[in-house]
Design a protein with these regions (language model features):
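Long, Pro/Ser/Thr-rich low-complexity/intrinsically disordered regulatory tracts in eukaryotic proteins
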Residues: 1-418, 427-428, 435, 439-735
Length: 735
């Protein structure tokens, strides 16, 4: 019996849309997003039928001579039909999409309400399968927790990470906060909550991301890399595949045909920021510039930037083989930039205020460079053709170098303002560097999973010989294809010293990153499920044990949690340090503690972790609420010792679980199908950044970052503690 061939996650579009075509489908989608689960065509049909019914007794001559005879029945029909749709959508918004009862129940024993909710969900998916953003306006508003609950939960999370004397003082200032300025700030937060769909996201994006004056490289960038197995494509072919597949993804997102996760239950608001757009630096605050789907992408090779069109002059998308020839011709040119001009992209690694000043001076005030900057900032995405062939997974050193290079680049081959910078090394292995401010890691991971599904499982790869033959560029190809256009920047006074300064600064920051990539193949989540514990809870408890062994203490720990079931939401902080987790770690370090006690405490700690996850998913987080209160206090001129204390605490341990977004890749069929995951820089100078994911049922992938300049941390040492923790925790279930 033949295996079922994987399906494309989005349409294979043949042409780049013209202005009229794009206007047409965007207009349709505008109605779709305001009428679902009723489609625009049936909606118009109902209006037409209702209008015709009201006019059945009128003669055609009367209708032709008196327009108001038609307008009144038409207005009644539109009002009546839309009123029904309006009521239906409000029922769905406030009852169906707002229902979170299933999170509180045993999945094996659902309540009647959950059974009814599940049945309604199946009916909706059957009669009106949603497009990418069909349900976005139906998602409930992010709830505002009570002030007392938030402060109480915060104090619970700080009990084990704060010295006793400081904790007593924290309780005192929290009580004063609750009885004075906290109440006033909560009232302003309540007003924000009532008059906006999400009282957090606008503040979060502005003050956590766009107002930050730090360099985007390492501090805001996140990395994604691909499969464990060897790549069967040459570098040129892999670059062409990226250009082709990601152009299709870009156009599908714009058409709202991109297959979303969650079947309409999750916010897709930030997918529109993945392609075409660019973060624009400002002297005090950046902004994100969205652009319509572009016809070109950027390719950088040996420090030289090229505009590569992904369609011909008539808008017909180039095939992979045609793009292969365009990329091959580009790579074999003798027009490469030299000297400091080959490092011009390092300007984007600078602090944001300085980059804003240099952008104005070197680009906007120069007519030629301003034109080229527009080409860059409106491009779909960037693809870096890297010269290194050292990317691999054969050793820890190679895997760690692979992950680090994907995160940082070399200072000349990433335009960090762009949301997506893909990279392909000389041996054909690839990865991507994402800019975090316009979207979250889960959305970028979704994009990368879809790419891998198409690249490795759907498209057929030619033999090595066929690839090399197709890379040959004939005279006929030069006449019929639109070849890459080099971006020839003009030298401006002062540019050389600034480029060299930025490049050296980035090189120093890159060398300070201590990356250790763990590819743990001893077991995966399959083994953990047989133990009856949460896989994420298992890894988080292992992290807590490893950190305690590494530092001799518990610390405030960040884990990103999802609240995307609420409108325009991004992430919330899940705090893994609990009474149960600390009791478990202490038992593990106690030689006198029996194995059955340790096992019991591990299960309780994982259960507490799962319950915290559910609280986050229901909108009952702590940190985003307190963050908004901090912003309001500063804006309104309130002095708050409690909020000052909260905002001054460092995240010495920052973690993130990169979820499997699509389940489109069978990671259990072969070790070569394991997706290696991602990484990010440690948030604190003396802290660790830990990004992990499960490679199906057979692996745990983890990237640990710290800084060589810190005397407190060591990624290699922490990695050893992590592997020991994995084995010691699973050994509790040996019998």
């Amino acid at each position: 019996m033949s295996e079922k061939k994987p399906k494309w996650p989005y349409p294979r579009i043949a042409y780049h849309p013209g202005k009229f075509e794009r206007f047409s489908y965007r207009t349709y989608n505008w109605f779709e997003n305001r009428l679902w689960p009723v489609r625009p065509v049936p909606f118009l049909a109902l209006i037409t039928t209702a209008t015709g019914y009201q006019l059945k007794n009128f003669d055609v001559q009367d209708l032709q001579t008196s327009l108001h005879v038609v307008l009144k029945p038409l207005a009644i029909s539109i009002g009546s039909v839309y009123a029904c749709v309006f009521l239906l959508r409000h029922f769905l918004k406030y009852f169906f999409f707002s229902y979170k009862g299933y999170l509180k129940e045993n999945p094996k024993k659902p309540s009647y309400w959950t059974i009814i909710w599940g049945a309604l969900r199946r009916v909706l998916l059957k009669i009106a399968p949603p497009q990418l953003s069909s349900c976005d306006r139906l998602l409930p508003n992010l709830p505002l927790p009570s002030l007392d609950d938030t402060v109480e939960r915060y104090l619970c999370t700080m009990r084990h990470v704060t010295p006793e004397e400081d904790y007593i003082q924290l309780i005192k200032i929290s009580n004063k906060f609750l009885s004075s300025e906290g109440r006033t700030l909560q009232r302003f937060a309540w007003l924000l909550h009532k008059f906006s769909e999400n009282y957090v996201t606008p503040f979060w994006e502005k003050y956590i991301y766009l107002a930050g004056r730090y360099s985007l490289a390492i501090n805001s960038s996140i990395a994604h890399i691909v499969m464990y197995g060897d790549n069967d494509l040459t570098q040129i072919y892999q670059v062409a595949r990226i250009l082709y597949i990601e152009t299709l993804a870009n156009l599908s997102l714009d058409r709202q045909k991109y297959l979303a996760v969650g079947e309409g239950l999750l916010s897709t608001r930030h997918y529109r920021n993945i392609y075409n757009g660019c973060r624009i630096p400002g002297k005090e605050c950046d902004h994100f510039q969205r652009n319509p789907p572009s016809r070109h992408a950027l390719v950088v090779h040996k420090g030289t930037w090229y505009k590569v069109d992904t369609c011909d002059e008539n808008g017909k998308l180039y095939s992979v083989d045609e793009l292969v020839k365009i990329v091959s011709e580009m790579m074999n040119r003798n027009d490469k930039s030299t000297g400091f001009m080959s490092k011009i992209a390092s300007l984007t690694t600078d602090r944001r205020t300085e980059w804003s000043i240099n952008r104005q001076k070197f680009f906007l005030e120069n007519r030629n460079n301003k034109k080229l900057l527009k080409v860059i900032e409106t491009a779909q995405f960037v693809v870096s053709v890297d010269e290194t062939d050292a990317w691999g997974v054969e050793t820890v050193e190679k895997a760690s170098r692979y992950m680090k290079d994907t995160l940082t680049g070399d200072g000349s081959n990433r335009w960090f303002d762009k949301t997506m910078n893909f990279a392909v090394c000389a041996n054909g292995r690839g990865g991507a560097t994402g800019e975090h401010s316009p979207c979250d890691g889960a959305e970028l991971g979704h994009l990368c999973e879809n790419f891998l599904n198409i690249d490795k499982q759907i498209l057929v790869s030619p033999s090595r010989e066929e690839q090399l033959e197709n890379e040959k560029v004939l005279d006929e190809d030069r006449k019929t294809l639109k070849l890459a256009e080099k971006l020839n920047f003009e030298i401006v006074d002062g540019m050389e010293s600034e480029v060299e300064r930025c490049f050296e600064s980035h090189l120093k920051a890159t060398n300070d990153i201590h990356m250790h990539s763990i590819i743990f193949l001893d077991f995966g989540k399959g083994k953990l499920k047989t133990c009856g514990i949460s896989p994420d809870g298992f890894v988080q408890m292992a992290i807590q044990l490893a950190y305690y062994k590494d530092q001799g203490k518990f610390t405030q720990t960040y884990e990103s949690g999802s609240v995307r079931s609420f409108a325009n939401s991004r992430t919330e902080t899940l705090r893994p340090v609990t009474d149960a987790s600390c009791e478990f770690v202490e038992a593990m370090l106690d030689e006198k503690s029996e194995k059955k006690i340790k096992r019991k405490l591990l299960k309780e700690a994982c259960e507490a972790h799962v319950n915290n996850c559910k609280q986050i998913m229901m909108g009952n987080g702590v940190d985003r609420h307190l963050f908004v209160l901090c912003v309001l206090a500063k804006g309104l001129g309130y002095s708050s010792p409690f909020l000052d204390y909260y905002s001054s605490q460092k995240w010495l341990l920052s973690t993130s679980n990169a979820p499997n977004m699509t389940n489109s890749i069978d990671e259990d069929c072969s070790v070569n199908n394991i997706v290696l995951g991602g990484s990010f820089g440690a948030v604190a100078q003396d802290g660790y950044g830990i990004c992990y994911r499960f490679g199906g049922n057979q692996a745990i992938l983890m990237a640990i970052t710290s800084y060589h300049s810190s005397e407190m941390t060591d990624s290699d040492r922490m990695a050893q503690h992590m592997k020991e923790a994995f084995h010691s925790l699973v050994a509790l279930f040996d019998e």
